[in-house]
Amino acid sequence: MNGIKLRGTGRCVPANTVTNDDLSRLVDTNDEWITARTGIRSRYRCEKETLTELCVSAARDALHMAGITPADIGVCIVATVSADTVVPSAACLLQRALGLPEDTPCFDLNAACTGFVYALHTMECLLNASDRKSTRLNSSHNNR
């Protein structure tokens, strides 16, 4: 990424953890089988949290780390396959929740597991093609 610097990151995970043993009570599998094939021992699952709530929390942490305000954001991209609603987009809900300027271009990018990579490339292209200085990129998935 030419001339682009990642200035802040944030993360937020749901409170509920689902282990492989939890899954083995639902389907015919076990911890050893899942771990051997995926390396995964547990994952997070949303019960009450929404994708937007997770995005807002992570975004606030990233803004704080970067030392910028919502007014500094020129583009908002959310990479997700599990938005709370089809319309408005997760990016538009994030725009409203963070108080981003009304003229901020906001959109979701749906590319499954590669969504973050595609969104990062899109962000780079937008920054290089405009006078915008900062973008907000969220890569979020809500497992219910």
Predicted feature residues:
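Conserved beta-strand segments that form the floor/walls of ligand-binding pockets within enzyme
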Residues: K5, I77, D108
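Conserved catalytic cysteine-centered active-site region
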Residues: T35-R37, R41-E53, V81-R132
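Short, acidic Gly/Pro/Ser/Thr-rich loop/turn segments
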Residues: R11-N16, A83-T85, R144
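Conserved "HGTGT" condensation-loop signature of ketosynthase/thiolase-family condensing enzymes
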Residues: M1-G74, R96-L98
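Short glycine-rich or small-residue beta-strand-to-loop segments that form or flank ligand, phosphate
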Residues: G74-V81
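Short acidic/polar active-site loop segments enriched in Thr and Asp
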Residues: G74, R132-K133
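Single conserved hydrophobic/aromatic residue that forms the stacking wall/gate
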Residues: K133, L137-R144
